[in-house]
Amino acid sequence: PHPRFLHSFPTRRSSDLIKAVVALRSVKEACEIEEIDLACNIGYEMHTAAMRLCKPGVKEQYIAGVLDGIASSYGSMTSFATILTQHGETLHNHDHSHILEVGRMMLTDAGAERLSNYCSDHTRTVPVGGKFQGRQKDVYNIVLACHDKALEIARPGITYMSVHQEVCKVLAQGLKDLGLMKGNIDEAVAAGAHALFLPHGLGHMMGLDVHDMEDLGQIYVGYDDEVRPSSQFGLASLRMGRRLQEGFVITDEPGCYFIPALIDKWRAEKMHTDFLNYDAIDKFKDFGGIRLEDDILITPEGSRFTGEKRIPITIKEVEAIMNE
């Protein structure tokens, strides 16, 4: 449009209009859910291919390219720039330059976007070489328990902020059992000590965008007059906090990351020493990171996975498909 035409419009954003759009797009109709299911079916093919290709000596970029090709072969495209890395401790790591090494884990956060623009978004973390080792099993099962806790309690009427906080308690208890955290779990989570390992939120809206409607402002999409965002480290990154409604499609994506620079910073600043066992944590600095993510539909009774088949997620399922 001609600049003079654009100048005739007010520069202010209408919060009432934004709220109306959010209300319309938040609850998905049956035809929208069908499109998301189809996108998730493509995501299944992408992630299972990545698992089969995850072998020592393979370059990350090769696997990432294969995932792009799978999406394209279904007449779709990736729904965002694929994250595929053996350095999962770096969040949103788009560097695919490494050669996969035995003893590391490959984190793949990838999805498909159909021509209708409806998206999928899944994450799996698998052991290079196809077999989980000692402490990998321990941390993986903690993250899986967090993931399953969210599925267990997510339902209409509950706030996703409260789901996030319950998941954080599962994480903290698991890390306490490993000797990495200590003290009262409820107090540790309230203080935000667990955020050393989980510096992001549990999930976000899904739909026409991977982070659906994020451009309208997360304060309108994930929050409302009742549930307000927090300023606490970690919890401040929760994109979706408000009460769930039937028809919402959201992500469930807990993680556990050992970020050397963050560990060193917190230790130097004596952060949460009542709850964190830094001597034990230091031994995990070379661990990397784990995230497990599914897209879920809020139903009248609770929630369900989107897509026809769930991407392998238990240790037994993952090892089986990696060693076919």
Model-found features: residue ranges?
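Single conserved hydrophobic/aromatic residue that forms the stacking wall/gate
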Residues: 1-11
